[in-house]
């Protein structure tokens, strides 16, 4: 048996296990929205039917002197069921690959901010583009092969004005490109606007 055949057989077996465990539910859902659009609340409702959920917070570790950010975190925590487990990590690829329970990732925007810092993008350190590509590809590979239900929340960054700073434009471009590729491998892509949910078409534009 060739390596390709072995990988295909393993993938089919994993898919069969997933179907037996979770039925024909959508496995990978991408929820997009602007600030205060209701995207996180919607994502939490999508996962409410699962008895055990791992909530993944992939953003930078907040400083202790930011009360506004602490209040946002407290609001999110208060909404989540007590039996949900929270994991704070920037290693999304490993988290997705090793997942045995449904995952809610909130959000890809804060993860991109963290990764840009990790790879030295803000300081334009030598080789940061290559390191960034590696981190993105690792996550995208894990997302593509995911075998537990996953809802990923992300910011829709393509509808506003062009950011005034170079760092803002870099963030917008990286996250926009990531959203496009995550959506291409998702079973469902949903846009939340003013608390209303729009189910986007299944076919991507060429």
Identify what each model region corresponds to.
Residues 9, 15-16:
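Small-residue hotspots
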Residues 18-26:
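Phosphate-binding P-loop
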Residues 29-98:
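Conserved P-loop
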Residues 43, 76, 104, 155, ...:
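Residue-level signal for inorganic ion chemistry
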Residues 53, 103, 188-191:
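Short, well-ordered beta-strand core segments
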Residues 60-61, 110, 158-160:
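A short, flexible beta-alpha/helix-coil linker loop
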Residues 79-119, 125-135, 143-144:
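Portal/gating segments that form or line small-molecule/metal binding sites
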